[in-house]
Regions:
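Glycine- and acidic-residue-biased ligand/ion/polar-headgroup-sensing regions
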Residues: 42-61
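Short acidic-glycine-tyrosine-enriched beta hairpin
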Residues: 61-79
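Basic/polar N-terminal segments that are highly enriched at the extreme N-terminus
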Residues: 1-13, 101-102
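Histidine-centered metal-chelating micro-motifs
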Residues: 34-37, 75-85
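Short beta-strand segments in beta-sandwich/barrel cores
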Residues: 36-37, 53-58, 74
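Ligand-binding loop in jelly-roll beta-barrel domains
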Residues: 79-102
Length: 102
């Protein structure tokens, strides 16, 4: 992964590294309402939402996607690059498991 688009580097204090080995990287994400994060990349991921989350993703081509998660919802995605904004009224709190080897 290009370090200039590494979520942990771009996300600043929003991301906290919980575990990393040669197969996975486990991150905790906490974004306050209105918070924005610059363009960054993820390999394939599984994410768990601790609470309600409402976010807008901006893709490299400028298109936007609104993402709404419920408490306890789990999502999976292949590799992607995006910028993020918490458009909700509550903190976005996710456990993000990045898969290094599939």
């Amino acid at each position: 992964m290009d370090k200039s688009t590494d979520a942990l580097k771009v996300g600043g204090e929003a991301y906290r590294l919980l575990l990393e080995n040669d197969r996975v990287r486990v991150l905790e994400l906490r974004m306050k309402p209105g918070a924005k994060m610059g363009m960054h990349s993820h390999p394939s991921v599984v994410a768990y939402s601790f609470g309600e989350a409402k976010n807008r993703w901006t893709l490299p081509d400028g298109k936007t996607e609104d993402m709404q998660l419920k408490a306890g919802q789990v999502i999976w995605s292949g590799p992607f690059t995006h910028a993020a904004e918490n458009t909700g009224k509550t903190e976005t709190h996710l456990l993000v498991v990045e898969l290094k080897k599939i």
